[in-house]
């Protein structure tokens, strides 16, 4: 009897945690989709800038937060929002122009470097394409020094 009670408590706790994560990621996904449709690509990817929020403001994440919520999940199903978010970072980074990529790198290299190497590699690609050899070399050096394990694409 005690065993069944313990199992019930564990299942209820897990179910409650799963529902909370599901609800939060659905909210983040809806916000990310809205920002994406408005052309606010970096906000769609990274969510709201937490440094600009006041205490009473509600935080809304982006595709990154949806992915982070479910990435290490081993039990239970992942929601559709997770699978729909998987390709968004690459799609968004490939849509950014040189100025947006540079701003992205400058802002997030210190705060949260996820996707910074990908953005720097895309900036390398655009620099090479436009003949901006100085920027190409700068981004190559940046990637080599700051992210030595990142595999730069052949350009």
Report each predicted region and the residues it spans.
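Sec/Tat-exported extracytoplasmic proteins
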Residues: 40, 52-55, 130, 147
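Alpha-helical membrane-targeting segments
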Residues: 20-21, 26-27, 65-71
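Hydrophobic/aromatic side-chain positions at a characteristic register within alpha-helices
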Residues: 17, 24, 29, 36-37, ...
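Hydrophobic membrane-insertion alpha-helices, especially the h-region
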Residues: 2-20
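Extracytoplasmic/periplasmic/luminal assembly and interaction segments
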Residues: 36, 47-96
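Short extracytoplasmic/periplasmic juxtamembrane "stem" segments immediately C-terminal to an N-terminal membrane anchor
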Residues: 28-48
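Structural signature of alpha-solenoid helical repeat scaffolds
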Residues: 16-20, 77, 110-111, 131
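Non-cytosolic head/periplasmic domains of membrane-anchored proteins
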Residues: 82-155
């Amino acid at each position: 009897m005690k065993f069944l009670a313990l199992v019930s408590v564990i299942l209820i706790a897990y179910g409650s945690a799963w529902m909370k994560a599901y609800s939060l990621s659905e909210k983040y996904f809806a916000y990310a989709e809205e920002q994406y449709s408005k052309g606010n690509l970096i906000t769609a990817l990274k969510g709201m800038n937490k440094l600009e929020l006041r205490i009473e403001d509600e935080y809304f994440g982006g595709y990154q937060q949806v992915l982070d919520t479910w990435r290490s999940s081993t039990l239970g199903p992942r929601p559709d929002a997770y699978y729909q978010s998987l390709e968004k970072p690459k799609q968004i980074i490939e849509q950014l122009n040189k100025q947006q990529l540079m701003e992205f790198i400058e802002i997030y290299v210190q705060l949260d470097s996820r996707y910074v190497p990908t953005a720097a590699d895309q900036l390398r690609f655009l620099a090479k394409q436009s003949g901006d050899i100085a920027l190409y070399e700068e981004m190559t050096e940046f990637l080599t020094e700051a992210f030595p394990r990142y595999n730069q694409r052949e350009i």
